[in-house]
Structures are given as structure tokens and as C-alpha cells.
């Protein structure tokens, strides 16, 4: 049985923080590959065109053989939901033990996800703690235990692992804001991604 991790998200744009999280998962958990899955129509978010986000992911991950980018959501209609993505990937990759990489803030909302109670036991959860808000590892672990307890009340089981990652205070929203006001995003994203953003005028008033 192979062990694969899904890293789903908007990735608008992908940045070094995302890459550090994925690399930490590879180093700390016995998984063979990280499958990056950009959301086509993420719930509660307005994102750049899918083709741009997919292209930036491919540029950022092309030098790591343990990273692969999936366009599984490309032809899906409606809102992108995690359980549909995992179901589709399971068809493409049978006989797989699945992991799902997620940030702590997002993991906290898992009990309220679309069919979240059904999704929770389908994979192990690899959680990137949010340290920029002042939380420490102990507080992050407590939050994870609270989520597990909520799901247990609904007769669901869940397995989670807290990833140990360096503190990187960068977010996609910050990068978009900086670029929009003409500030440098060098060293916040891979250079190929920065060049792509400039070439396609993403995050500016006259973006494609």
C-alpha cells in the first residue's frame, strides 16, 4: 500500500510557507509523495483563474520529484469540496493510505465542512500549526484534541499529526496586498512564480 498526502488549497499564489509545510510532511511522516490540488471553485473565496494558479504550482514544485500537481478539479462543476477531491483521487490512486495536509485554522472548522463527518476518518490529518498569532505547540495540540472530541461526539474517528515547521509569517493574502500596492514580493515566493505573476499582471488593477 502506498502512502500519499493531499495538499489542497487555493494557492493564490503558492509561497515558500506552503512549500516548507509540504517538505516537513515528507520528512516527518512516511509518505512517498505530496499531491498538490488547487481548488477550482473554493467555497467562500474568490480566486484568480484556475489556469494561473495551476501554472504557478507547477513552476514552484517542478524541481522536487516527491511533489506532483493534480488538476483533478479542473472539469468539476460547482463548489470544490474536499470529500469529492479525495474520492476522485482514490479512483486514480487505488490501494492508498491517504493523508491530508491542512493549516490549523482550517482544521478547526472540519466539523462544519461539507460531509466533514464522513471525510474525517478517510485520511490521516497532517496539521501545520499557526504560530504567527502567538499560539505555541501545546495550544495547537489542544485545539486538535478539541476538534477530535467534537467529531467523536458525532461517532467519527480521526487521526491527526502536528507538523513541526519553522515560523514563516507569510500568507497568500499578504503577497497579493503587497504586490497590489507596488511592494516587493521577492523571497516570499519562488522566483519562477514571481516572474509569472509579473508576466501575467496578476494581483494588479489590469490583471488578466
Swiss-Prot record:
Which gene name does the record give? nadD
A Pfam family of this chain: CTP_transf_like
Report the HAMAP family cross-referenced here.
NaMN_adenylyltr (MF_00244)
Tree of life domain: Bacteria
The pathway is: Cofactor biosynthesis; NAD(+) biosynthesis; deamido-NAD(+) from nicotinate D-ribonucleotide: step 1/1
What's the name of the protein?
Probable nicotinate-nucleotide adenylyltransferase
Please give the family membership noted in the entry: Belongs to the NadD family.
Q: What is the documented function of this protein?
A: Catalyzes the reversible adenylation of nicotinate mononucleotide (NaMN) to nicotinic acid adenine dinucleotide (NaAD).
Signal sequence annotation: none
Q: What class of enzyme is it?
A: transferase
Protein species of origin: Nostoc sp. (strain PCC 7120 / SAG 25.82 / UTEX 2576)
Which UniProt keywords are present, listed alphabetically?
Answer: ATP-binding, NAD, Nucleotide-binding, Nucleotidyltransferase, Pyridine nucleotide biosynthesis, Transferase
Annotated CDD domains: NMNAT (cd02165)
Please name the GO terms that the record assigns under molecular function: ATP binding; nicotinate-nucleotide adenylyltransferase activity
This entry's Enzyme Commission designation comes to 2.7.7.18
> Sorted alphabetically, which NCBIfam families does this protein's record hold?
cyt_tran_rel, nicotinate (nicotinamide) nucleotide adenylyltransferase, PRK00071.1-3
Biological process GO terms, please?
NAD biosynthetic process
Database matches in InterPro entries = Cyt_trans-like (IPR004821), NadD/NMNAT (IPR005248), Rossmann-like_a/b/a_fold (IPR014729)
Spell out the reaction equation it catalyses.
nicotinate beta-D-ribonucleotide + ATP + H(+) = deamido-NAD(+) + diphosphate
Amino acid at each position: 500500500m502506498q502512502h500519499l498526502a493531499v495538499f489542497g488549497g487555493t494557492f493564490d499564489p503558492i509561497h515558500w510557507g506552503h512549500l516548507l509545510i509540504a517538505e516537513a510532511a515528507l520528512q516527518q511522516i512516511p509518505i512517498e509523495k505530496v499531491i498538490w490540488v488547487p481548488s477550482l471553485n473554493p467555497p467562500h473565496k474568490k480566486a484568480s483563474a484556475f489556469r494561473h494558479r495551476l501554472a504557478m504550482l507547477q513552476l514552484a514544485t517542478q524541481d522536487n520529484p516527491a511533489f506532483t500537481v493534480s488538476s483533478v478539479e479542473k472539469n468539476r462543476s460547482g463548489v470544490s469540496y474536499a470529500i469529492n477531491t479525495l474520492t476522485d483521487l482514490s479512483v486514480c490512486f487505488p490501494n492508498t493510505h491517504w493523508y491530508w495536509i491542512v493549516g490549523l485554522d482550517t482544521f478547526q472548522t472540519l466539523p462544519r465542512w461539507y460531509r466533514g463527518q464522513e471525510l474525517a476518518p478517510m485520511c490521516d490529518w497532517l496539521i501545520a500549526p499557526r504560530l504567527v498569532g502567538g499560539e505555541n505547540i501545546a495550544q495547537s495540540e489542544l485545539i486538535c484534541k478539541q476538534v477530535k472530541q467534537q467529531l467523536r461526539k458525532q461517532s467519527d474517528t480521526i487521526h491527526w499529526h502536528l507538523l513541526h515547521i519553522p515560523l514563516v509569517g507569510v500568507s497568500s493574502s499578504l503577497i497579493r496586498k503587497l504586490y497590489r500596492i507596488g511592494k516587493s514580493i521577492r523571497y516570499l515566493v519562488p522566483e519562477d512564480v514571481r516572474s509569472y505573476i509579473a508576466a501575467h499582471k496578476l494581483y494588479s488593477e489590469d490583471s488578466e
